[in-house]
């Protein structure tokens, strides 16, 4: 598969037809590009915005990192779909993944307890979708074809995504 002058490939040969689950569990770059194109650039970009991946995180520390600004140009949809083309801080990545598996709520990370015990959150996906994503991310670690089997630690429910 090509995007402009860049070749997009997989580390190994995959079947022509794969389920979304298999694409994610086995980490097919070509498959994730196809999924992203099916979703469409606008919806994909809006979802990344909902996850707060385009802005500097709001946090109580002055030394908080900022994502490198980028332009949404040719091949950006494709490269972001398989984990390249966008930078995030570890805090942003943790908050985004937490939202995907905690029932769909994006929670603003904080070090300070709110005096009224208010938690700032925003629903970004349905509870049902979150359950499905959690199942797939667990299979990335536990499935024989999963790409993160070394992360499967006895006594812990580890979820993951490589690539």
Regions found by a protein language model. Give the residues of each.
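Beta-lactam-recognizing serine transpeptidase/beta-lactamase-like catalytic domain environment
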Residues: 1-163
